[in-house]
């Protein structure tokens, strides 16, 4: 039993290290222009409103919890596409999985690992995020926040991260 516990601890530590390495600070290129944050985005605690797209985003990935003045805490929960499409937050049914272009609108093209503004979306891991945009009967689009690129060739049974959005402020 003792050896079993030690193996579980090793696996847990390995998983923690993997997650921590994907949460390292973004690498941003100062030579590429970044959009001024203040003119486009308004932060409201655990949400951020994008004036350009009229969308409000959860600042934390699904599974994480917003801590005022502390960012996002906890582990990102990975879901298959059907589960992600069925997510409903208590008290507000307006939250949904974003379309490919919507999720692509928050990619920071001057950054990678993650390719997102970490002031607005702290704790975003450099992993794939589901979109609601399908590609045939078995596939859906994802945005890979390691690079900011979108791709369509992932089976909907695969588990990826989720960031929820709603229309309006």
Regions found by a protein language model. Name each.
Residues 2-6, 20-96, 100-169:
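Glycine-aromatic-enriched surface loops/turns that form tight recognition elements
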Residues 10-20:
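Bacterial N-terminal signal peptides
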